[in-house]
C-alpha cells in the first residue's frame, strides 16, 4: 500500500486552512478543512488532525466502528478547549474525513463535507456522506445532484468539529477489494474537479504524480479554495 499527498493554498485564498496527516504503517489517513477568521481555521484543522492521530497511535488495538467516535470527540473537545483559552478564535471549526484500511476492510468516517472517494477501473464512488445544506436538499428531493453541484449555498455545512459539543458523524465500511485506490480531499477539489475528470487522471497519470495533477486541475478551474488530496493505492 502506498500513499501520496499534496496541499495547496489555491488561487484566491491567502492562507491554507486545510491539513492532512498520513500514517503509512498503520494505514490511517486524515484530511481536515478549517474555517474561521484571524487564521483560526488553520489552527482548528491542525488540532483536529493531530489530536486524532495521536489518540489513534496510542491504542494497542483499534476498532474503527467503536473507536472512531471517541477520536472525533477528543478532537472536538481539543478545539473547544483552545477556543476557551483564545477567545479571538471563537467561531472556528473544521471538517474532517478519515480512512482506515485493514486486511480486508476499508473504513471511512467524516464530519462536514470533506470527502473520500473509492476509485475502480471504471468508476469513482463517493464513500463519505456530506453534512451540508445541499446534501439535505438532495436527500429530500428538492434538488438534483447536478443542481447541488452548482447551488449557490453548496458551501454551507451542517456539522463540524469545534463548533458545539454535539455534531453528526457518518461512518461506513466497504470491502477493500472493490477499489484500486481511495482519494481523500477537501472541497477545494470536489467543488472544482468532476468525478469524470478524477477518474481520467487516475487512469492516465503515474500514481506519484496524481496529487499534483489533481491540484493543478482544481486551480485551472478557478482554485477558489484551498485544495488538499491524499491518494492511497490499495
Residue ranges and their predicted role:
Residues 1-234:
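PP2C/PPM-type serine/threonine phosphatase catalytic domain
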Amino acid at each position: 500500500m502506498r500513499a501520496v499527498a499534496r496541499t495547496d493554498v489555491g488561487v484566491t485564498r491567502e492562507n491554507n486552512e486545510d491539513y492532512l496527516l498520513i500514517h503509512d504503517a498503520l494505514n490511517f489517513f486524515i484530511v481536515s478543512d478549517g474555517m474561521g477568521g484571524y487564521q483560526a481555521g488553520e489552527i482548528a484543522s491542525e488540532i483536529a488532525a493531530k489530536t486524532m492521530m495521536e489518540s489513534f497511535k496510542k491504542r494497542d488495538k483499534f476498532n474503527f466502528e467503536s473507536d472512531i467516535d471517541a477520536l472525533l470527540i477528543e478532537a472536538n473537545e481539543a478545539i473547544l478547549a483552545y477556543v476557551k483559552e483564545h477567545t479571538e478564535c471563537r467561531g472556528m471549526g473544521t471538517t474532517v474525513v478519515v480512512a482506515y484500511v485493514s486486511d480486508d476492510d476499508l473504513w471511512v468516517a467524516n464530519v462536514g463535507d470533506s470527502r473520500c472517494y473509492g476509485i475502480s477501473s471504471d468508476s469513482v464512488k463517493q464513500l463519505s456522506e456530506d453534512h451540508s445544506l445541499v446534501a439535505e436538499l438532495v436527500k429530500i428531493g428538492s434538488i438534483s445532484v447536478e443542481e447541488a453541484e452548482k447551488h449557490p449555498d453548496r458551501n454551507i455545512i451542517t456539522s463540524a468539529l469545534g463548533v458545539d459539543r454535539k455534531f453528526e458523524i457518518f461512518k461506513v465500511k466497504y470491502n477493500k477489494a472493490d477499489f484500486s485506490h481511495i482519494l481523500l480531499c477537501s472541497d477545494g477539489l470536489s467543488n472544482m474537479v468532476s468525478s469524470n475528470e478524477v477518474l481520467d487522471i487516475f487512469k492516465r497519470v503515474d500514481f506519484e504524480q496524481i496529487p499534483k495533477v489533481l491540484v493543478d486541475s482544481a486551480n485551472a478551474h478557478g482554485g477558489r479554495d484551498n485544495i488538499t488530496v491524499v491518494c492511497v493505492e490499495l
